[in-house]
Amino acid sequence: MDHAPYGGVVPEIAARAHVESIDAIAAEAMRAADLGFDQLDGVAATAGPGLVGGVMVGLAFGKAVSLARGVPLVAVNHLEGHAVSARLGADIAYPFLLLLVSGGHCQLLEVSGVGACKRLGTTIDDAAGEAFDKIAKTLGLPYPGGPALEKLAVGGDAARYTLPRALLGRKDCDFSFSGLKTAAARIAETLTTDDERRDLAAAVQGAIARQLSERVDRAMKLYKESHAPDEQRFVVAGGVAANGAVRAALLADCEKNGFSFAAPPLAYCTDNAAMIALAGAERLALGISDDLDAVARPRWPLDEAAALANPANAYGRKGAKA
């Protein structure tokens, strides 16, 4: 079912679509891989964080296959899937500095191995991808808004509008996009021409790319204090990693600070099953699996210690944020 008329994902529609589609999609995936279920060595299923209705459907399906075939289950944090997604297209060794940037998440992490993440910074309000999508909606663009805004921004004059630069000069690695989102929405209400909309799209894209670049530059300096030169690897993952302006800004950070750059193939920037399979395979290779009583988790921080240490940024009314 199409979420576009609603301007975003509707949880109830998404959960029902999972129920209706998962059997056929799993069967098609096995046909495409030319494999039978009897050839599986294990099953990896997303257990969170995310909209819990859909997560429960996928996790239940994974448990059923695990039980029926007698193979181990790995309940995967989907953020860990993003963390390893660049390894789908390249041989990237641990450790590395990761920018995980999507519609729901914006974090900087040191990734030292499978499941070993130390958070350096996170958003204190909205994620970058959410800012892209919400501002795109105010400009009358279709969902998903990020790609539509990037397309509109081509040829726009980013200097036409002055937008706020949040947390400028801060020595930490946190992000903030709520002020940008509000300012852009107010400007959007006054626009009357396509050129104005194009220029605002370019300004928004530039502002988001600039803030990501500034915080990554800070994180690289911190990372270098505790890592050898041959460990200076940078990975960007998540849906926003597909944005060309963002990639260009982050590439410039890498060149400035002496880091290698890696990102998933464009097809694997957004949520996908391949990254979950890889995360599960890496855990299985280390002998790590989960019991069939693994639960679906709407919130699941990658760095539990950081979440506990900074509850103001890490916890909401419904528990630990991702």
List each language-model region with its residue ranges:
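A short helix-loop
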Residues: 92, 100-101, 108-196, 252, ...
